């Protein structure tokens, strides 16, 4: 005969799938939650702004203008045979996607603390939805690039067909770095102050306003340890065509670092995921 006192103390614990296969099946089962979180974040971002989605166009456009004046007009840096605004904006697209993803991912778990602490679902859905929201901004900003191409009568070469490959690499870099920051920010809230600094510093050391070809040859391989360098160079190679060249050793190094970042990001996130509800 069961003891009522013992029965009253029993708890029901719902855990994530113990096997990797079950975990990814859980993500598919909860796909509607993923759609909801992504759509909610898109709506909230622009709902109470005066000009709405136009903010996704204004910020990269103004940054492009500043970089064009400083590096193209004043510093007279080479443009790889393309109009300087197109050179800059072909790098602004992946950089903005990457930097926005870091900012959104790092705070995504904290911002959904009530949901995470009360309901079981694969936590990977939360930062992934944040990256998808940043990708929507990326697609919107792409209209500026199309406008610049039309303005300068710039016609891309067949290389443009390889652009989806580099978009995939940018997505992997954003996810990998975002998962690390999202996981660390749950336990160490200092990262809410560190991430904006990392994003600002990353803009200065990445070839957004200039071509990476201006970096001295002896430093280019070391410079390519920055994973976003290979992504930006790939975007420019695909979009600009013509004189633009892809520094293959540096690109492969950046690609390897992106793969490492992506795989290790998923591994670490899965490792600490079960503690999120306790410490958040």
Give the ranges of each region predicted by the language model:
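Hydrophobic transmembrane alpha-helices and immediately adjacent juxtamembrane helices
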Residues: 1-280
């Amino acid at each position: 005969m069961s003891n009522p006192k013992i029965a009253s103390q029993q708890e029901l614990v719902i855990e994530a799938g113990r096997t990797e296969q079950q975990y990814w099946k859980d993500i598919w089962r909860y796909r509607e939650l993923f759609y909801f979180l992504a759509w909610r974040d898109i709506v909230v971002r622009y709902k109470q702004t005066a000009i709405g989605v136009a903010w996704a166009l204004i910020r990269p456009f103004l940054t492009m203008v500043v970089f064009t004046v400083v590096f193209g007009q004043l510093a007279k840096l080479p443009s790889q045979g393309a109009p300087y605004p197109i050179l800059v904006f072909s790098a602004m697209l992946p950089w903005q996607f990457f930097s926005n993803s870091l900012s959104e991912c790092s705070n995504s778990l904290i911002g959904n603390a009530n949901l995470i602490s009360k309901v079981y679902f694969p936590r990977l859905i939360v930062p992934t939805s944040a990256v998808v929201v940043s990708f929507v901004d990326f697609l919107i900003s792409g209209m500026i690039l199309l406008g610049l191409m039309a303005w300068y009568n710039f016609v891309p070469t067949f290389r443009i067909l390889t652009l989806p490959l580099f978009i995939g690499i940018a997505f992997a870099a954003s996810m990998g770095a975002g998962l690390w920051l999202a996981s660390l920010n749950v336990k160490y809230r200092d990262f809410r102050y560190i991430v904006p600094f990392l994003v600002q510093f990353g803009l200065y050391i990445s070839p957004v306003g200039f071509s990476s070809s201006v970096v001295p040859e002896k430093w280019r391989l070391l410079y390519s340890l920055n994973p976003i360098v290979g992504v930006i160079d790939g975007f420019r190679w695909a979009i600009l065509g013509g004189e633009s060249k892809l520094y293959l050793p540096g690109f492969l190094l950046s690609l390897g670092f992106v793969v490492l970042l992506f795989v290790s990001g998923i591994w670490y996130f899965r490792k600490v995921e079960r503690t999120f509800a306790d410490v958040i």
